Amino acid sequence: MTVRVGINGFGRIGRNFYRALLAQQEQGTADIEVVAVNDITDNSTLAHLLKFDSILGRLPYDVSLEGEDTIVVGPAKIKALEVREGPAALPWGDLGVDVVVESTGLFTNAAKAKGHLDAGAKKVIISAPATDEDITVVLGVNDDKYDGSQNIISNASCTTNCLAPLTKVLDDEFGIVRGLMTTIHAYTQDQNLQDGPHKDLRRARAAALNIVPTSTGAAKAIGLVMPNLKGKLDGYALRVPIPTGSVTDLTAELKKPASVEDINAAFKAAAEGRLKGILKYYDAPIVSSDIVTDPHSSIFDSGLTKVIDNQAKVVSWYDNEWGYSNRLVDLVALVGKSL
């Protein structure tokens, strides 16, 4: 069955999700159709930003407008909505939408996201950490907990999707007592281009000119997908002046002693086995630009593994836009199987 999708919010993640879907469709791995997008931006701007992208380049499809409310991408026609009144006002039922990808960043609590269900959708996937959701899913880590009964689903954050495979391998193989992480993260639209007012006074500073320390909920969110680690991890982010391509540094106290070789072997086995497609193993001395447009959630850098006694440091890269958007596509496919 083809899963019919509506996208609410056609910004960075909404457009990346659609591009990732096109890429997977070309490979024959996604039976998903986007039937509508909703955004308060005018349709000509949406079409232009889909066609031209500063990171991903030009979309290899013709993109045009048909009438006032249809975006044409190659052979596909997408209904373009401009509903401002909130999720409950969207015509998902009339359009036969099965799953909504909620990517505005505005409706991340269950009470607001439920409006999509009231409007006729069967499931909602929030492309961000959420509150009061039915389940948070990180593919490869706890997707077995999704049983079809949950209607409001969070795909967690890009950083949690990178961190969770690290913690899973370490905890499964050696046991984690506690840990601290840092994500060195590309800047995002939540930061200022130039110094200006912001509720976070560090994010108030010019994103392209500074290393900006700020918060991340990624470590604490691990407890949602690995309950045995609840309260055992914490950390923060350092936003850096690049547009995409981030890296997570995790230092953990292990229950069992392990060498660098033991840890690297465990990650290589996981990348080639149970976490294939989610976790990637690298021995090459890579830098951030090398992993841009890599679809994996977590790209393990074996050359950076360090161990002192029972304390281990592991590092994994991730394209915080493209990798995450590919997991959104995969999660839509997973949810679609339960419809």
Swiss-Prot record:
Pathway info: Carbohydrate degradation; glycolysis; pyruvate from D-glyceraldehyde 3-phosphate: step 1/5
Pfam families named in the record: Gp_dh_C (PF02800), Gp_dh_N (PF00044)
CDD domains recorded: GAPDH_I_C, GAPDH_I_N
Locations listed in the record: Cytoplasm
Lineage: superkingdom: Bacteria
Keywords, ordered alphabetically: Cytoplasm, Glycolysis, NAD, Nucleotide-binding, Oxidoreductase
Any one annotated GO CC term: cytoplasm
Disulfide linkage: none
Chain residues that bind D-glyceraldehyde 3-phosphate: S157, C158, T159, T188, R203, T216, G217, R239
Enzymatic reactions: D-glyceraldehyde 3-phosphate + phosphate + NAD(+) = (2R)-3-phospho-glyceroyl phosphate + NADH + H(+)
Binding site for NAD(+): R12, I13, D39, R84, S127, N320
EC number per UniProt: 1.2.1.12
GO MF term set: glyceraldehyde-3-phosphate dehydrogenase (NAD+) (phosphorylating) activity; NAD binding; NADP binding
InterPro entries: GlycerAld/Erythrose_P_DH (IPR020831), GlycerAld_3-P_DH_AS (IPR020830), GlycerAld_3-P_DH_cat (IPR020829), GlycerAld_3-P_DH_NAD(P)-bd (IPR020828), Glyceraldehyde-3-P_DH_1 (IPR006424), NAD(P)-bd_dom_sf (IPR036291)
Residues with site note (Activates thiol group during catalysis): H185
GO BP terms: glucose metabolic process; glycolytic process
Residues at the catalytic site: C158 (nucleophile)
Similarity field: Belongs to the glyceraldehyde-3-phosphate dehydrogenase family.
The protein's role, per its UniProt record: Catalyzes the oxidative phosphorylation of glyceraldehyde 3-phosphate (G3P) to 1,3-bisphosphoglycerate (BPG) using the cofactor NAD. The first reaction step involves the formation of a hemiacetal intermediate between G3P and a cysteine residue, and this hemiacetal intermediate is then oxidized to a thioester, with concomitant reduction of NAD to NADH. The reduced NADH is then exchanged with the second NAD, and the thioester is attacked by a nucleophilic inorganic phosphate to produce BPG.
Assembly and oligomerization: Homotetramer.
PANTHER family: GLYCERALDEHYDE-3-PHOSPHATE DEHYDROGENASE 2
The protein's name: Glyceraldehyde-3-phosphate dehydrogenase
Organismal lineage: Bacteria, Bacillati, Actinomycetota, Actinomycetes, Mycobacteriales
